[in-house]
Structure formats: C-alpha cells, structure tokens
C-alpha cells in the first residue's frame, strides 16, 4: 500500500508534552468500525464499562531504562567530539545496539566516554568501543562494564529517552522518570514506554477487578526503532525494526482459556498486540514465545487472537497508525483521528487514549 494513504495533518498544539494528572483522567475515544464508524467520547476511567466479566486485559510490563547517553568520542589525541546515543537493543551482557547522532562522527574502533554532562557514574567512568556501524545511524557498542554493573552505570549517567516530538521541545527532567513509566513496570530493558499503559492507576485496577476483568502481563522491550520514520513510498518496501520479548507458558495457557470460555483478549498498547500476534498460531492459539519480533501489521492482515485494543494516538505515516488502520479500518481511523483533532484530544506518548473494536 502507498504510505501516503496513512498521512494526516496534525496541529503542533495537539502534541502533549506532559501527561494528564492524575494518569487515569485522560480522555478515551471509543471507536467501533460498524459500517459508518461509531465514535464515542469517554474517559479512561470508563474502560470497565466496555468490558465483560471474563475478558482479559494484556499489559506489557517492560520497564524503561535511562537509555539516552551523552558522551565524548576520543580517537588518539582527539577527545573533543560530542556524540549522543540512544540504546535500543541489548545483544549481550556488555553489548548494546544504539542510534548515534551524528553517526558520521563515529567509526569502528572509536572509544566513547560517558558522564561528562554533569552526571557522574558511581562506578567511575563509563566507556564503550564502537564495534560496528550499521544503517540509519545504528552502531554496536561494547562497554567496559557488563551485566548488573553496566546497568547501574547506565542508570547513573543516562537520561530518559523522551520521544523526538517531546525532546525537540523540552529537556527531560526528574518528573519524566516517573511519568514515562507504567505503574506495573518490572522487566528492565525498554527505551520507550508502552504508552497506553501510562493511564493505569490503582483506582482503575480496582474498578476492573470489581467488574471481573482478568489481567495478564507479557514483556516486549520497546526499542527506539519505534520512532523511526517510514522512508519507503510503499509499505512493501519498509523494513520493520525488531524488538525482544516473551510470553511465558502459564500466561499463554491462561489466555487460551479465556478465549475458550468466550472472553475477549484486550491488548493495552500496540506492543502487547504485536507480541500476542507474534505468539499466536493461525487458529488463534497463543503459544509460549521468546525472541525477536519484527511483525509489521498493515491493512489486509488477519488478526489471530486480539479482539480489542487500547492505544494512544499515533504519528502520521507511522507503522503504528498502519497497525490501528489494519485493526479498525483505514477510513474508520482517518475519521476517528479527524474527530480527535477537531475536539482537542491530546496526541502521542503523553496524550489521550482510544479504545478500538476489531473490524470484522
């Protein structure tokens, strides 16, 4: 499909720079693709009223790490070249893939020292060697530390990797360390938040429990590749980024039991959906799963296991707007987004939410 079919105009003032407070006070646009789309303006706290006892919410419990690193490249006696790196995938205890800016300043064998911007590494200096250069500014780094020691050092010197559309307008701060994290995050490794989950609070969970709604957790470590623009003119020519995740055997079995009883699988966020669909067989049976997924969902995809999707509002021509268009219909989503813009919904990671029913 032509990528420009997924384009739309978004006013700059529609982009949220801070989340709603409290988290569960955000708005929620309910979208039912029944012929002419049925759109309903509600709030996140209304979510339980759209679910039935025995339905299951699926959450991504990945935890965002401060993966934005500011460093200085040194090559021989040249130690004056600043570089910015966003870690996006761990490939070994001491090795990470990262996006570098400006990547042209780096080559294999260069050393980078981190923690010179006012943040001190408690374990001493944090350094890495550039092992490889890839496409689109990607590099592979081998750090001098490994495992938990490296994790502690990154925590000390790193910054929360805010999405580009926020970072271009303001610097990260201490509030973001809490705001850009779900209340149920536990598996460290993401460099972007599963943002639909940011709306959940203990109050909302209590209401869901009262309604007999089940909840389960899977893990997909969201990478910085989620923000990469689609540069191809046709979706068939786009190469999707990969992310690491897993669905454990107990969770897979319980989700299958929900489906067998007639309950619906409701994914909180596109990351949960992509992982569940990666784990699902053709018949919808959800299998235990672990590894890297590069699933790219566009209109025409047949959803195997997911019945409903709660998700924030996405960028024009992004792979995530393509995904929601596959789920609820391209015309439906264009109508929904036009309504959201006209009625003042807040967009993107810190913005409002939508609840989508799957198109038959």
UniProtKB/Swiss-Prot annotation:
PANTHER family: S-ADENOSYLMETHIONINE:TRNA RIBOSYLTRANSFERASE-ISOMERASE (PTHR30307:SF0)
Lineage of the species this protein comes from: Bacteria, Pseudomonadati, Pseudomonadota, Alphaproteobacteria, Hyphomicrobiales
Enzyme Commission number, as recorded: 2.4.99.17
Gene3D superfamilies noted in UniProt: QueA-like
Gene Ontology CC: one annotated term: cytoplasm
InterPro entries according to UniProt: QueA, QueA_dom1, QueA_dom2, QueA_sf
Chief localization: cytoplasm
Coiled coil, from the record: none
Protein name as annotated: S-adenosylmethionine:tRNA ribosyltransferase-isomerase
Class of this enzyme: transferase
UniProt keyword list: Cytoplasm, Queuosine biosynthesis, S-adenosyl-L-methionine, Transferase
GO MF terms held by the record: S-adenosylmethionine:tRNA ribosyltransferase-isomerase activity
């Amino acid at each position: 499909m032509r990528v420009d079919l997924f384009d739309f105009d978004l006013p700059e003032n529609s982009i949220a720079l801070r989340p709603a407070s409290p988290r569960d006070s955000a708005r929620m646009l309910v979208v039912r693709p029944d012929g002419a789309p049925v759109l309903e303006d509600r709030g996140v706290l209304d979510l339980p009223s759209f679910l039935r006892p025995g339905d299951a919410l699926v959450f991504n419990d990945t935890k965002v790490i401060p993966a934005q690193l500011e460093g200085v490249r040194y090559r021989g006696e040249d130690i004056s070249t600043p570089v910015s790196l966003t870690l996006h995938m761990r490939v070994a205890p001491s090795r990470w893939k990262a996006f570098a800016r400006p990547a042209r300043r780096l080559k294999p064998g260069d050393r980078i020292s981190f923690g010179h911007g006012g943040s001190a590494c408690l374990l001493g200096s944090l350094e890495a060697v550039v092992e490889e250069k890839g496409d689109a500014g990607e590099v592979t780094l081998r750090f001098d530390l490994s495992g938990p020691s490296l994790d502690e050092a990154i925590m000390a010197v790193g910054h929360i990797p805010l999405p580009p559309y926020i970072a271009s307008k303001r610097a990260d701060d201490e509030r973001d360390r809490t705001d850009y994290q779900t209340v149920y995050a536990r598996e460290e490794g993401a460099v972007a938040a599963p943002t639909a989950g940011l709306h959940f609070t203990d109050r909302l969970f209590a209401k869901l429990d009262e309604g007999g709604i089940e909840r389960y957790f899977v893990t997909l470590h969201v990478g910085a590749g989620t923000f990469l623009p689609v540069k191809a003119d046709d979706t068939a020519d786009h190469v999707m980024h990969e992310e690491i995740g897993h669905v454990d055997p107990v969770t897979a079995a319980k989700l299958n039991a929900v489906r067998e009883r007639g309950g619906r699988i409701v994914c909180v966020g596109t990351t949960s959906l992509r992982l569940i669909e990666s784990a699902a067989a053709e018949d919808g049976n959800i299998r235990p799963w672990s590894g890297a997924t590069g699933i790219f969902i566009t209109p025409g995809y047949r959803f195997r296991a997911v019945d409903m999707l709660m998700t924030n509002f996405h960028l024009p021509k992004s792979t995530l707007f393509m995904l929601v268009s596959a789920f609820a219909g391209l015309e439906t989503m264009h109508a929904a987004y036009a309504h959201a813009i006209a009625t003042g919904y807040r967009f993107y990671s810190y913005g409002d939410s939508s609840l989508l029913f799957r198109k038959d």
